[in-house]
């Protein structure tokens, strides 16, 4: 990191929210954006969703990476997105870069039903667990993660899975599948992987776990 980027960070980061802040605007942006991806994955053909995601990736990600080496561009972009940015993103790729990359990754590797449910986990379990953990997380597991946030993520993922399967006419093993999926989503939200942003790791880990569960309980056969 060069001195221009360091000095810019020192000047600006006090004006931006930290990870430990509730940051409602960011959570609303996150839920709205990821839920929109879910709707696209649900109502558009898989290849159309991937094309639209690829276009969004090409528009956003290169600019996000270039700004890290161009102080003037970085200052302009961070000023535009200040309401939804964190201070640690001033000199690192934004969460949206990891999110778009992660969704394209799972979209290429996993069935649409798994991708759709993983997007629901990311849209709602992640911000709700974060909110509960920040406001009420007195029992820490490690770092900023708490048991309160973990159980919030579990409950949200359980409810989302139950609703996802129920409205697709699947009742067989719905309770046990939903309970296991809730645990998978909560673990995906909890466990850090080599300091990679959870906007990438959560959908990937959720998709891996859900694929195993859906295969074991023959859920894919009912989703055809």
Language-model region placement:
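Central hydrophobic cores of alpha-helical transmembrane segments in multi-pass inner-membrane proteins
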Residues: 58-62
């Amino acid at each position: 990191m060069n001195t221009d980027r360091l000095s810019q960070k020192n000047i600006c980061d006090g004006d931006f929210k930290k990870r430990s802040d509730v940051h409602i605007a960011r959570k609303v942006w996150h839920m709205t954006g990821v839920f929109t991806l879910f709707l696209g994955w649900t109502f558009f053909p898989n290849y159309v969703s991937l094309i639209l995601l690829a276009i969004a990736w090409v528009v956003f990600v290169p600019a996000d990476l270039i700004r890290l080496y161009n102080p003037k561009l970085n200052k302009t972009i961070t000023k535009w997105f200040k309401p939804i940015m964190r201070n640690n993103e001033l000199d690192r790729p934004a969460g949206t870069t990891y999110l778009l990359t992660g969704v394209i990754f799972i979209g290429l590797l996993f069935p649409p039903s798994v991708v759709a449910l993983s997007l629901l986990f990311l849209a709602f379990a992640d911000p709700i667990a974060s909110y509960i953990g920040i406001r009420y997380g007195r029992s820490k597991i490690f770092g900023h993660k708490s048991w309160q946030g973990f159980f919030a993520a579990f409950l949200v993922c359980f409810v989302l899975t139950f609703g996802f399967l129920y409205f697709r006419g699947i009742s067989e093993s719905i309770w046990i599948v939903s309970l296991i999926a809730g645990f998978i989503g909560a673990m995906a939200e909890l466990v850090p992987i080599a300091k990679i942003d959870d906007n990438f790791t959560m959908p990937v880990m959720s998709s891996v776990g859900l694929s195993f569960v859906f295969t074991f309980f023959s859920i894919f056969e009912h989703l055809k």
